Amino acid sequence: MSEDRTRDSYNSGKSLRILVVEDHSETLQALSRLLSHFGHEISVADGAQNAKNMIDSKEFDVVLCDIALPDGTGYDVIAEAKRKKPVKAVAISGFAATEDIERGRRAGFDFHLAKPVDFHELRTVLGQIAA
């Protein structure tokens, strides 16, 4: 299968502008490469303040955000993002108990993915957002 056909099979909708916020460099790189391969436009931030600066300077369709960041929380990042413009928010977190997911929803997250991120689940969520 050609790379273009592979990319098309993974990108089940329009190309999205995605901000990935993750302090673990290997996870950040893996998500960035994968999402680029899916055909999305990716920006990255390694902490809450970097993410807020990017949100101030650029528009995003989706913010894919870790909850526990060294200089703040994903909850703060999403609150800032949603004040600027309606954006879909996807939590990526090692905290995946029912109460964690509910807290995320109350804070503004539309979806919650547990770490390690299941790439098929991520693709499904992005497909729902892009539809």
Which residue stretches match the model-derived regions?
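Non-catalytic signal-transmission and effector/linker regions of two-component phosphorelay proteins
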Residues: 1-19, 120-131
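Alpha4 helix (beta4-alpha4-beta5 surface) of REC/receiver domains from two-component response regulators
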Residues: 76, 96-111, 124
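Acidic, metal-coordinating helix/loop segments flanking the phosphotransfer/catalytic sites
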Residues: 44-62
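Conserved acidic carboxylate
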Residues: 22, 69
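Active-site residues of response regulator receiver
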Residues: 66, 93
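Short amphipathic alpha-helix used as the core "switch/output" element in two-component signaling
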Residues: 75-87, 126
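Acidic catalytic/metal-coordinating carboxylates
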Residues: 47, 73-76
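Two-component/phosphorelay signaling modules centered on CheY-like receiver
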Residues: 25-43
